[in-house]
Amino acid sequence: MGKTSQRKQCDCENPSKPCLSTSIPLRMSSYTFKRPVTKITSHLGNEVRYYQWEETLEKPEQACWQKRLQGLQAYSSAGELLSTSDLAKTLKDLTSTDTVASASDTQATSIDITSVPTLESSSHLANMIPEAGPQILCKEFLVTEQDIINQERKVKIARERLAVALIAHKLASEMETVRGSRKANL
């Protein structure tokens, strides 16, 4: 009985903790941020509570470079607006005419045309678009059914080799544990 009365006295002496409240929890980072930082997520049908000053907070900018480039437009050296289809067509025309013209040179040395970059087209492109600089343009690579079958075969062989290696590793580790337990028993 004496112990319980002592406990009651200790409970009465301890005031309630100030951190226990019904307000929205805030993460305070005084070193980095000037204001308390919270993440507000609203879901369909849910009511999200937030402070009035949080309504005016700016959302962070998109860090993904593709999203930032979506609104940009390409211009020619004359200042005309280029559409993406015109640019793609021009590049395709440049690469196809230059590779056909240089095909006789590459066939004499028996080098595959698709693997050789066209330097003439890059200089021609640099004349059309000075900001592009010297670039190496390559022909587009066509994937055939045979390429897919060969790749699937290589993947299957690699998986089989990996399975064999994992089984060998498992057996070796089991042998080590058995040897270790035998040495401990001796």
Curated annotation (Swiss-Prot):
One of its GO terms (biological process) is negative regulation of transcription by RNA polymerase II. Its main location: nucleus. The keyword Repeat does not apply. It is found in: Nucleus. Signal peptide: none annotated. It holds the Pfam family MBD_C. Highly expressed in testis. Not detected in the other tissues tested. Transcriptional repressor. Belongs to the MBD3L family. This is Methyl-CpG-binding domain protein 3-like 1. It comes from Mus musculus (Mouse). The gene is Mbd3l1.
